[in-house]
Amino acid sequence: MGELPIAPVDRLIRKAGAERVSEQAAKVLAEYLEEYAIEIAKKAVEFARHAGRKTVKVEDIKLAIKS
């Protein structure tokens, strides 16, 4: 884990209205977002394979998010 940089996550939290963000808070959210993104990606890969493709397309990602 730890693929997502902390700075963009910090900016997301600030966009949500926070004035200050602890480094630990940004790290925890980054870890959660990464886990969630991996789950979506895994589902999208399944959809692409089911369709007989090796390439994950936008529609695979959208379906994975909805499922």
UniProtKB/Swiss-Prot annotation:
Molecular function, one GO term: protein heterodimerization activity
Disulfide bridge positions per record: none
Pfam families: CBFD_NFYB_HMF (PF00808)
InterPro entries noted in UniProt: Archaeal_histone_HMF, CBFA_NFYB_domain, Histone-fold, HmfB-like
Subcellular location, record wording: Cytoplasm; Chromosome
Principal place of residence: cytoplasm
SUPFAM superfamilies reported in the protein's UniProt record: Histone-fold (SSF47113)
A single Gene Ontology CC term: cytoplasm
Keyword annotations from UniProtKB, A to Z: Chromosome, Cytoplasm, DNA-binding
Region of interest (Interaction with DNA), ranges: 20-22, 54-57
PANTHER family listed in its UniProt record: ARCHAEAL HISTONE A
NCBIfam families: archaea_histone
Record's subunit section: Homodimer. Dimers then assemble into higher oligomers, with the DNA wrapped around the protein core.
Biological role: Binds and compact DNA (95 to 150 base pairs) to form nucleosome-like structures that contain positive DNA supercoils. Increases the resistance of DNA to thermal denaturation.
UniProt record similarity statement: Belongs to the archaeal histone HMF family.
Protein name in UniProt: Archaeal histone A
Organism: Pyrococcus horikoshii (strain ATCC 700860 / DSM 12428 / JCM 9974 / NBRC 100139 / OT-3)
Lineage: Archaea, Methanobacteriati, Methanobacteriota, Thermococci, Thermococcales
